[in-house]
Amino acid sequence: MDLLLISLTTIIIAAYMQNLRRRGSNIPPGPPTRFLVGNLHQLKPLWTQSFSEWSQTYGPIISVWLGSQLAVVVSSSDLAKQVLRDKDYQLCNRHRTARMTQNGSDLIWSDYGAHYVKMRKLCTLELFSLKSIECFRSMREMEVSSMVKSIFNDFMSDDQKPVVLRNYLDSVALNIVSRLVIGKTFEPKDGREFRSIVERETRLPGATKMLDYTVWLKRLSSWFTSDKAFMKHMARKRNWFKRAVMDEVYGGRDQKCFVQSLLELKEKDELTEETVMGLVWNMLTAGADTTAITIEWAMAEMIRCPTVKEKVQDELDSVVGSGRLMSDADIPKLPFLQCVLKEALRLHPPTPLMLPHKASESVQVGGYKVPKGATVYVNVQAIARDPANWSNPDEFRPERFLVEETDVKGQDFRVLPFGSGRRVCPAAQLSLNMMTLALGSLLHCFSWTSSTPREHIDMTEKPGLVCYMKAPLQALASSRLPQELYL
């Protein structure tokens, strides 16, 4: 017991002295802290809300203490440009926690360096080049067509039963991504298991966040048996699922896919087993989430704003007509549909708080010091709703993108759904194509009305790394095209 007390005292004193040293430097201002836990106790379930509120008080660059870890949060487009372009090299490492980060052996959570560059180049060549996107066009169209047919068959059996759109969006997104990555679609049961694992991982309990960021709690984490058990349980489920996927792949696939290329490199000793599984997990989780989340928000906004929905449908009727389904080739001819998607990405970025960067050396941002080792967050949602950048920023107005051509793939720092700089999402163009095709097909094939009064649609966000609607969108569907197109 005496040894435990001495150890605890030593850890607390060390943490206190470390905080004192850091606070003495010219770091950004921020809210008052509590000893040992910093600002963790003040954070709302939606961290972006807390960061946005503090930015209103302390300015667009703030310091937030996540236990003993300093986090610098930027909430303006000018400061985002400094972090993601001007000081990108010094700030492009990853802050990794004990959970869900693959030990940095994958792409998303690896530090910037030779491994990251190699993995990114591999993913780009195999999956995200314009040639690859075009090569898999018919597959995307086939999966979206299957989604349309499923919706039609379901509502035909009971046209007064609301459609829970998320069920179909999750399935089509996962099917497209899984066919790209592993050359097959999941069985329904496996797909549900996959989505369950991902959802629970992105919404871990509060105590786990405390353990992630508080050094002295990490060292005494044996006290938190239930939380540790949860993390171990999720790690086992994740590893079991990845192993099951890899076993399927090792069994042989006739169709060329991403993981086959990885295995060829593995046989040449250029990749480890851990890296192969990490990359597969990255591609499956990131690709499926972004598509389903964005389309659900876009549909919710349009059902709340029927004039926008009707304008998109008029455009679709003019370009596609009523004798066939929408194809990828139609996308360039549908500017207003593209504007709707951009506006949905602006108001509801799939990752409202950019995944954490880490300073590899001390740098100046916005006139303040960002110390080496500090975590750096870009508050994507706050920037996208900044009245300095957008008129009526909280309103759904797709036409704003007709007036001004705006890039959403990392070049315009006012809207950053895919990040920017060395860490920009390599799948941005593929994601945009998938989302535009799926969203356009839903609007072209069906008329949509709310199953409740429009003003009662719950637009609350669900806490987590990614931004799902808290209450899944439900709507009534009716067909707009000749019946033979749905068969």
From Swiss-Prot:
Keyword annotations from UniProtKB, A to Z: Heme, Iron, Membrane, Metal-binding, Monooxygenase, Oxidoreductase, Transmembrane, Transmembrane helix
CC terms in the record's Gene Ontology section: membrane
Membrane topology qualifier: Single-pass membrane protein
Presence of keyword Oxidoreductase: yes
A GO term for molecular function: iron ion binding
Cofactor: heme
GO annotation terms (biological process): spermidine metabolic process
Residues bound to heme: 425
PROSITE patterns to which the protein is assigned, alphabetical: CYTOCHROME_P450 (PS00086)
Transmembrane segments: 1-21
Tissue specificity as recorded in UniProt: Strongly expressed in root tips, inflorescence tips, young flower buds, stamen, tapetum and pollen. Detected in aging vasculature.
InterPro entries: Cyt_P450, Cyt_P450_CS, Cyt_P450_E_grp-I, Cyt_P450_sf
Subcellular location: Membrane
Record's keyword annotation contains Transmembrane: yes
Pfam families: p450 (PF00067)
Chief place where the protein resides: membrane
Family: Belongs to the cytochrome P450 family.
Known role: Acts redundantly with CYP98A8 as tricoumaroylspermidine meta-hydroxylase. Involved in phenolamide synthesis, but a recombinant CYP98A9 is unable to hydroxylate triferuloylspermidine. Unable to use 5-O-(4-coumaroyl) D-quinate or 5-O-(4-coumaroyl) shikimate as substrates.
The protein's name in its UniProt record: Cytochrome P450 98A9
Chain's gene name: CYP98A9
